[in-house]
Amino acid sequence: VRARAPASSANLGPGFDTLAVALDLYVEVEVEKASRLIVRSVGEGAGMSDDPSHLAARVAIEVAGTDRLAITVRSEVPVGRGLGSSAALAAAAAAAAGAKDPLAVAAYMDGHPDNAAAAVVGGLVAAAMVKGAVRVVRLTLDVSLVFVIIVPDLILSTAKARLALPNEVTRENAAFNLSRMALLIAGLADSRVLLKEATEDRLHQDFRSPLFPAAPNLLSKLSAGGALAACWSGAGPSLLGICRGADGAKVQQAAKEAMAEADVPGKALLLGPDMHGLIVDRDGSDDFWRDRQPSWSADGQGDTDEAGGTVPDGGGQFYDFDGNR
């Protein structure tokens, strides 16, 4: 059985540990019965341990109840960069191993419900733990938006990034983030009202900047290059520029130039939102990797209705902990 799950960018500035958007960059996991445990990794993360400590192996063994498995991982998602690689891997491994509740398994094994929700449900999501279960709502997303991701050659673990945060926050800063998150949700639903201030944050980004000192300057360059808003991607060190589709290539070039000027090795990716989430193939179909055309159009207009207006992704869909609508 094969399963594929998308990368994701969590937090999106003010939505700390709550918001995430799925990106069209993928992890595929294939699980088969075998006489002993075999783990193979191709692509990003290929240098990681190919033994029972591998996250895909731990998830698959937990779900299948046996270690007599052959597990193959093919990943496009950079590891330790704030792009939800472990959540995507956990979701795909859980589904390929036969989990009935891949969202619950991924959230438990990865520890990040926001990334896990985006990997399973796709699109823009808000996630929360409620009485020990993951509750998810898929929010409306303007599909004309694209994302420029600065991915530095710097690995930053979520645990280390979290240690940089204060144990307490002021009421003023909590209210600041709540107001910005409201603006952000509205702006992501309709890019015409997306303000650059919508990704402002007082809970985590500034505290993490010492771990990647070039971040503030690069974020400014993303905005100056044409991004509607910019923020850290997850716990970093990757940085996210939210753009109109027509501006994506221009912002990507600005990101590359800013990285070169700041002497930050790495790459700048131009990605669309993934609107499908987790996909499972039990039949070995040749078209499992569907047409890789992005869900956003080259002219930045998104899909259009008969009247010529942009069609947003439908929001307001609630999911329980097992990922079922």
Predicted feature locations:
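Solvent-exposed alpha-helices and their adjacent loops that cap or buttress functional pockets
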Residues: S9-L12, A20-L23, G82, M109-G111, ...
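Glycine-rich, charge-dense phosphate/pyrophosphate-binding loop(s)
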Residues: G187-E306, D313-R325
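Active-site rim beta-loop-alpha module in soluble metabolic enzymes
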Residues: V148-P210
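Phosphate-handling active-site elements
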Residues: A34-R36, G65-A70, A96-Y108, K131-R135, ...
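Short beta-strand-to-loop capping motifs
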Residues: K33, M129, P152, G241-G245
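ATP-binding N-lobe of GHMP and related small-molecule kinases
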Residues: V1-R81, A99, M275-R282, D287-R292, ...
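DPxDG-like acidic metal-binding loop motif
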Residues: L23-L25, L83-P102, V120-V125, V130
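Alpha/beta catalytic cores of group-transfer enzymes, especially the acyltransferase/condensing modules
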Residues: D101-V146, P210, P216, A230-W232, ...
